[in-house]
Design a protein with these regions (language model features):
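Residue-level signal for mature regions of secreted extracellular proteins and peptides
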Residues: 13-14, 61
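Bacterial signal peptide processing site
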Residues: 21-23
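Positively charged n-region of N-terminal signal peptides that target proteins for export
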Residues: 1-5, 9-11
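Post-signal-peptide N-terminal segment of Sec-exported extracytoplasmic proteins
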Residues: 43-72, 128-139, 143
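Mature, soluble, non-transmembrane domains
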Residues: 71-170
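Post-signal peptide N-terminal segment of mature Sec-exported envelope proteins
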Residues: 29-48
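C-terminal motif of bacterial Sec signal peptides marking the signal peptidase cleavage site
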Residues: 16-19
Length: 170
């Protein structure tokens, strides 16, 4: 009996501690000329919203509208008790992408992009020295400065699920 109570207590504790915060997923959609879009989706449950955020959803909407950098556009939606804010970083070339990313990060990004389509080399090489979490630092900063969240590390707020690369629609 003690073992069952202990296991139940352990399971209950894990469930309480597993509040995920904001699930962040990202897709970089590229064309051969390096034009494209980086799409970053932030999804959170109502429970996580009330656990992390000291304000209403209207406050959050207003904060995002006022704080969203010029390089980004965004949409928001709600479904099944989850809210999603999707941010779009559109770019026309590698130089345009680097400039917009530099403005978001406040440092010069290192981005490696090579594409080969010949009998000797075929494929894509893509590397960057930052994550979507880094690109969303502006939102964390705005939330903290507006006193909507405590100064926990941003790693406690963001849960980066994945970043995918889509090249030529594949």
């Amino acid at each position: 009996m003690k073992k069952k109570v202990f296991l139940f207590g352990l399971l209950f504790s894990l469930l309480l501690l597993c509040g995920c915060g904001v699930n962040l997923t990202s897709t970089v959609k590229l064309n051969k000329d390096f034009s494209g879009t980086r799409v970053m989706s932030c999804t959170f449950s109502s429970r996580d919203f009330h656990s992390y955020f000291k304000g209403s959803k209207e406050d959050l909407n207003k904060l995002i509208k006022e704080s969203c950098p010029d390089a980004l556009t965004y949409t928001s939606s709600s479904s099944d008790g989850n809210d999603t804010y999707t941010f779009y970083l559109r770019f026309s070339s590698l130089d345009d992408y680097k400039k917009k990313v530099r403005d978001l990060l406040n440092f010069s990004p290192e981005i490696t992009y090579e594409y080969g389509d010949s009998p000797f080399v075929s494929g894509l090489i893509y590397k960057e020295n930052f994550t979507s979490k880094d690109l969303m630092t502006w939102l964390y900063t705005a939330l903290y400065e507006g006193k909507y969240i405590d100064k926990d590390p941003s790693s406690d707020l963001w849960d980066l699920k994945s970043t995918k690369i889509s090249f030529l629609g594949k």
